[in-house]
Amino acid sequence: MFRGATMVNLDSKGRLAVPTRYRDLLNEESQGQMVCTIDLHQPCLLLYTLPAWEVIEQKLSRLSSMNPAERRVQRLLLGHASECQMDGAGRLLIAGTLRQHAGLNKEVMLVGQFNKFELWDEQTWYQQVKDDIDAEQSTQEPLSERLQDLSL
C-alpha cells in the first residue's frame, strides 16, 4: 500500500528518483516494473506496479469496444499506458508525452493512493489540495453512506 505525498525532482532526461522507502516494496511486488498512464479526471498521471496494472487491463478488456464511452476509456488508459522499469539507482523514466500531458517539469509530487501513485506538477498539486479543502468546507451535499461510516 502506498501512502503519503513526497516532492521529487525530474532530471533532464525525465527520470524521477523513487523515494527509498518504496524501492524495496516495488522490487518485491514487481521487480521494479511499473506502468504509467493518464488520469481521466485530474491533471496528473497514474503509476502502477505491473501486477496492479494487469488487473486493470483485465477489467478494461471486458469493456465493449462497441460502446462509445467504454471505448473512450480503453483508448485513453491503454493508449497512454507506458511501461517503465526502475533502474539500479531507483529511477523511473516517465515518457515525454505523459510528462507533457500532466504538465510535469522539474518539481513533481509523488502521491500514494493505496495501490498506485499519482504524479502531479508540484504547484498543480498544492492548488488541488487547496481546492479540495475549500470544497469540503463549503459543501452542502449530504455525506454518502460510506463517508458516514468513516470514523477518523
Swiss-Prot record:
Residues 5-52, 81-124 form the SpoVT-AbrB domain. Keywords: Cytoplasm, DNA-binding, Repeat, Repressor, Transcription, Transcription regulation. Pfam families: MraZ. GO terms for cellular component: cytoplasm; nucleoid. One of its GO terms (molecular function) is transcription cis-regulatory region binding. It is found in: Cytoplasm, Nucleoid. It comes from the Bacteria. GO terms for biological process: negative regulation of DNA-templated transcription initiation. Negatively regulates its own expression and that of the subsequent genes in the proximal part of the division and cell wall (dcw) gene cluster. Acts by binding directly to DNA. May also regulate the expression of genes outside the dcw cluster. Forms oligomers. Belongs to the MraZ family. This is Transcriptional regulator MraZ. It comes from Yersinia enterocolitica serotype O:8 / biotype 1B (strain NCTC 13174 / 8081). The gene is mraZ.
